[in-house]
Amino acid sequence: MRNAILYIIIISVCSCDIFQDAEDMGIYPVNYKILSLGDSYTIGQSVCDECNFPMQLKDSLQNTLRLDTLNVEIIAVTGWTTTALINSVDPVLENNSPDNIFKENDLVTLLIGVNNQYQNRPFELYENEFPELVNKAISLTKSQSSNDLIVISIPDYAYTPFGQSGPNPSITSQEIDMYNTFAENHCLENGINFINTTDISRQGLIN
């Protein structure tokens, strides 16, 4: 299941405008920077440092595209809500040092919200803070364009042994859908790339 989700992410990234433009011109970026923002799904809780999806994405892109260097930075911690991620991104945006490694990215990925749901935070908090995070993420791209941001849907942990041990997995799935629907609609309305990994995550109990 994890490989299937990664495959969808990679295919979507490779179809982004920056790669299409480079292909049309017969060239590829020489140096490429990716920043991944999120929580445990991004950092890869309980997996090796090279096994999380940003690092696997890096390896796949290096094998696919002619890049001299490809650097990946991650701002993500297990348990982070949208509020916690905002509090960590703000100092990055305020740091105007030329040594700030988190700015001027060719691609930014954003996967956030599962802990808002899990910690029973008011949904209105996500409605307010997700669009704010999207804008901050765009500000961290080199182009300052929504074309270079990819939002990834929240996987459904109800379809894991942990999720099945909870009091009501079906409620978890309904709430995950509510978060993802809001995020997807916001992305559609603002021309932002949105990748749905939730459907594949719901095969977790059979794969």
Task: Please tell me what each predicted stretch does.
Residues 2-8:
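Sec-dependent signal peptide recognition
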Residues 12-15:
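C-terminal motif of bacterial Sec signal peptides marking the signal peptidase cleavage site
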Residues 17-78, 98-102:
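Serine-esterase "nucleophile elbow" of acetyl-processing enzymes
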Residues 41, 79-81, 156, 201:
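Residue-level detector of flexible, active-site-proximal loop/helix-junction positions
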Residues 43-46, 83, 117-121:
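A generic structural signal for short coil/turn motifs at secondary-structure boundaries
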Residues 78-96:
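Charged, often glycine-rich, active-site loop that binds/positions anionic groups
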Residues 90-207:
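Alpha-helical cap/lid subdomain in secreted, periplasmic
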